[in-house]
Amino acid sequence: MSLATLDISQHPNLPASAQTLFKAKADKKLSFEQIAQHIGRNEVAAAALFYGQAKASPEDIVKLSELLDIPTPLLEEQLSGFPDRGRSVEMPPKEPLIYRLYEIVQNYGYAYKAVLNEKFGDGIMSAISFSTKVEKETDQDGNNWAVITLRGKW
């Protein structure tokens, strides 16, 4: 199994909690899927906690503390504040996968906006009342496809 780790030199703007969480994740050899199952969130939401891009609930803190053997008071100190979202990646991003996601918005952003406005009227899709997931799909030729679902309240 290949596990996501953290190279802090590539992410100097992440909160202290990121180093704490990623070190424990690596020490325990846990995937985000395993962590998500333990805390009762999906794997993208769990990963967002590690990158400081989502707010941890008191229950998340207790469950992460149990799973990762991190003292609860330390996680309470590091995760109880409000996330400083959007600072973790310079723009435009240099990491190729992150750049491709950015490129999707560059290329299709106005097309998404036009279709969404036609379907829902004037407004915006929430990134607060929001969920997302990643699935793997394999076609009949054996090619793997990434399926990313974005679900936001209108």
Swiss-Prot record:
Active-site annotation: 100, 103, 126
EC number(s) given by UniProt: 4.2.1.104
Described function: Catalyzes the reaction of cyanate with bicarbonate to produce ammonia and carbon dioxide.
CDD domains with a match to the protein in the record: Cyanase_C
Annotated protein name in UniProt: Cyanate hydratase
Protein family according to the UniProt entry: Belongs to the cyanase family.
UniProt GO molecular function: cyanate hydratase activity; DNA binding
Gene name, Swiss-Prot/TrEMBL: cyn1
Species annotation: Aspergillus terreus (strain NIH 2624 / FGSC A1156)
InterPro entries, alphabetized: Cyanase, Cyanate_lyase_C, Cyanate_lyase_C_sf, Lambda_DNA-bd_dom_sf
UniProt cross-references to Gene3D superfamilies, sorted A to Z: Cyanate lyase, C-terminal domain, lambda repressor-like DNA-binding domains
